[in-house]
A protein has these predicted regions:
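Acidic/glycine-enriched connector segments
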Residues: 1-112
C-alpha cells in the first residue's frame, strides 16, 4: 500500500466490509521500511490500515532497487480486475498498466 489512491481504496474496502464481511483487504508490502520516510500522520494511517487487513504480504525483507515494481507486478498478478487512477505520466502506475495489459488483465480506469 502506498499513500494516495492506494490508501483511499483501502479505506473504501474497510467501509464496505462493514456491510459485506466476506470482503477482504490484502496488503502487498514491498518491504517493511516502506513508510519510514513518510510524515507521522501518514505512517499512523498506514499502521491503522495494516492492522485492519485480512492478510499482509511482505514481498522483500528490505528495500532494494526494483522492489516497488515487483510489488506492483505481484498486485497485478493477484488481481482479477485492476482499478486504476492514472494521469498518463511515466512511472510505476504506467509500468503496472503495461504489465497488466501484457498479462491480459481486465483494467477499469477511473481517470486516464
Amino acid at each position: 500500500m502506498a499513500r494516495g489512491c492506494d490508501t483511499l481504496f483501502a479505506e473504501s474496502v474497510l467501509a464496505v466490509q462493514r456491510r459485506c464481511p466476506e470482503l477482504r483487504l490484502v496488503a502487498m508490502i514491498p518491504c517493511p521500511s516502506q513508510p519510514d520516510a513518510w510524515p507521522e500522520a501518514d505512517r499512523a494511517r498506514y499502521s491503522r490500515l495494516l492492522a485492519a487487513c485480512s492478510e499482509i504480504r511482505v514481498l522483500e525483507p528490505s528495500y532494494s532497487d526494483g522492489c516497488m515494481l515487483r510489488r506492483n507486478r505481484a498486485m497485478a498478478d493477484a488481481a482479477a480486475l485492476l482499478v486504476t487512477v492514472y494521469d498518463g505520466g511515466p512511472g510505476g502506475t504506467a509500468a503496472t498498466i503495461r504489465y497488466a495489459r501484457q498479462k491480459g488483465k481486465q483494467i477499469l480506469p477511473l481517470w486516464y
